């Protein structure tokens, strides 16, 4: 059986958790391959809401093996808090497998993330302050702490002492903060070792062996394409690859083993943190989208910036990821609008109109959206289970977005519940 990639086509928060849940009964393994607890996903099952940050969505489905891949950076305190919360609600988390090569977020990563963001002032990126960026920076600088290091105390202490030799100089002399005690950091991590050990494995070998035995593996991205460190709106991005290429490097599964790439897109657009957002609404309609769509971050609780659907950005995500199927979510939120503009192009400062993402950051920051306006429907969609059940104007809206994306829409979300979906085509 194949590997399937599921990712976001916008700036994250597209509803990937619900899409994973729809697939869960047809998959055997569910893998997080990037990011850390800066990403959040919410799933509603039988009226129960589950909000998670590190654990793969598949943990909620009996029989599915949830895997945290080597591309993830793990805050072990957050991981075990999530496990304990789910266990208290009757969810079996004993199947969880964690890559020995995943990197670990330490206390000094969190401190550096917060003080750096404050130091930047108005130029700040808008990070969650959870140490994600500094942990990835250490990974690339080859001074990071990996999960496997927790089982070799000597190596762990050497790595932490070496890292803090430099970081404490920065904290004390530049940021006017106190130095961090390497012994305390190491002791904290070693305190997790015994509980963590039974979960740890060579996940690349595990997943490739599963594919060899005709199992289905779902590779689940955190964040979204436009937050990808290489292909997103840099520098206002996350620190990992949230695109299809990241699924390979973050899991150890080769590209020829991937059969489908499913992108999730909201029927409008949201963004958290700083950075360009061409269709952002600064008026009552933006606030209305935020209120009706409950657009507040799962991880931070911050209100999300809201705007109309950006077909230019979504089409870019289709190309970057080689998308085969689209899941459109939150169509029901738009039921409260008489008219619904869709961004079909950008107008550059020099007056040119383009239908592709501008090459430079400067151009993107100064584009104006070119809208085509469609009539709304103002009817409840939550009971719709086929395209024909939708009002004509809602059908027209979906068909227009599909035409602009150039990729078939396989699922349409018409509410937060697992059953509030229209399945146009099987995803697996």
UniProtKB/Swiss-Prot annotation:
Gene Ontology molecular-function annotations: adenylosuccinate synthase activity; GTP binding; magnesium ion binding
Residues reported to bind Mg(2+): 13, 40
Keywords: Cytoplasm, GTP-binding, Ligase, Magnesium, Metal-binding, Nucleotide-binding, Purine biosynthesis
One GO term of the biological process aspect: IMP metabolic process
Transmembrane segments: none
Cofactor note: Binds 1 Mg(2+) ion per subunit.
Compartment(s) of residence: Cytoplasm
Active site per the UniProt annotation: 13 (proton acceptor), 41 (proton donor)
InterPro entries reported in the protein's UniProt record: Adenylosuccin_syn_GTP-bd (IPR018220), Adenylosuccin_syn_Lys_AS (IPR033128), Adenylosuccinate_synth_dom1 (IPR042109), Adenylosuccinate_synth_dom2 (IPR042110), Adenylosuccinate_synth_dom3 (IPR042111), Adenylosuccinate_synthetase (IPR001114), P-loop_NTPase (IPR027417)
Sites where the protein binds IMP: 13-16, 38-41, 128, 142, 223, 238, 302
CC cofactor: Mg(2+)
Subunit description: Homodimer.
Function (record text): Plays an important role in the de novo pathway of purine nucleotide biosynthesis. Catalyzes the first committed step in the biosynthesis of AMP from IMP.
UniProt name for this protein: Adenylosuccinate synthetase
The organism of origin for this protein: Acidothermus cellulolyticus (strain ATCC 43068 / DSM 8971 / 11B)
Top-level taxonomy: Bacteria, Bacillati, Actinomycetota, Actinomycetes, Acidothermales
Gene name of the record: purA
